[in-house]
Amino acid sequence: MLKFTPDHEWLRLDGAPDAGIATVGITPFAQKQLGDLVFVELPAVGTRFDKGAVAATVESVKAASDVYAPVGGEVVAVNDKLAAEPGLVNAEPTGGGWLFKLKVADAGEIDGMLDEKAYEALTAAEPG
C-alpha cells in the first residue's frame, strides 16, 4: 500500500511490516509537474534523515526540486539505475523509478501520511 506526503513523495513498506524497510519515490503528479527529468541526486547509503529533511534532488528541463524524507530513517539502498536513466522516474514513478530505501526509525510516522484517497483530494485542488 502506498502512502503519500503533501510534498508529493510516496512510501511503500517492503516485505514484512516488522522489517521496517520502505521504498521512497516521487508521485506521478510530481513527475508530471516537473516534466522530463535529466538528473537525479540521491543520498549515500548509510545517511540518516529526520522526517521532512531534504533527502534527494531531481532536476528536469523546467526546474530542480528537493525530495523530502517522508519519515525518519537510514538509507539502506539507492536506485543506481537513475544515474544513467533519470527518465525512469517519469516512465515508472511508483515502480522502477523509485529513489531510495529507508530503514524506518519510527513506524508511527507512516500512520500520519496520506492515503491514496486523501492524496488524490489534495492534488485535485492543485493547479496542474
Regions found by a protein language model. Name each.
Residues 1-54, 87, 91-128:
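Acidic, low-complexity mobile loops and tails
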Residues 3, 62, 66:
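ABC ATPase A-loop
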Residues 48, 66, 72-74:
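Beta-solenoid/beta-rich acyl/carboxylate-transfer cores
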Residues 60-63, 80:
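Short, conserved catalytic or interaction motifs in soluble domains
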Residues 60-61, 70, 105:
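A short, compositionally biased micro-patch
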Residues 79, 85:
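Basic, polyanion-binding surface patches
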